[in-house]
């Protein structure tokens, strides 16, 4: 009887640990006819979603830290990190995101046309004294050795602007774009 109880305890511990993290691989068609790979890791213990977009110099890593309420993106070509306070009205809850990813991966029929634009001014929004406790350790690990900029949500890209945008997050799901430069 004791070996059976010990086996069930070990099985339940490993079962709980395996449910703590879930990984999704999504392939999105690119404009040049190829595919862009997105890897999404949902960590239920840390209450985070980490999105890696594998697209050459446009590759990025984005962390949605639901515990601390921040989103941070590191864009390979920019060699910088961008952080924004999470708007829970615009960003789905972690369990809804997880369900959406599951449905997208298994049925490959769900898509969202909505995009969230994040705007920053590189001359005014550099964060020089970073309070890592506020942002949490997942964002600290992502952005510790990079310049960190504060972003703001924009309803749509401005008509007249200089600079460029890079897509981060989930291209087909959350559609977050980082835009730098001067907007008139």
Curated annotation (Swiss-Prot):
Keywords: Disulfide bond, Golgi apparatus, Secreted, Signal. The keyword Acetylation does not apply. It is found in: Secreted; Golgi apparatus. PROSITE patterns: BRICHOS. InterPro entries: BRICHOS_dom, Gastrokine. Residues 1-20 form the signal peptide. SMART domains: BRICHOS. The keyword Metal-binding does not apply. Disulfide bonds join 81-143. GO terms for biological process: gene expression; inflammatory response; neutrophil activation involved in immune response; NLRP3 inflammasome complex assembly; response to bacterium; response to cortisol; response to stress; response to wounding. Gene3D superfamilies: 3.30.390.150. GO terms for cellular component: basal part of cell; extracellular region; Golgi apparatus. Stomach foveolar epithelium and duodenal Brunner's glands. It comes from the Eukaryota. Residues 54-151 form the BRICHOS domain. PANTHER family: GASTROKINE 1. Heterodimer with TFF1; disulfide linked. Interacts with TFF2. This is Gastrokine-2. The gene is Gkn2.
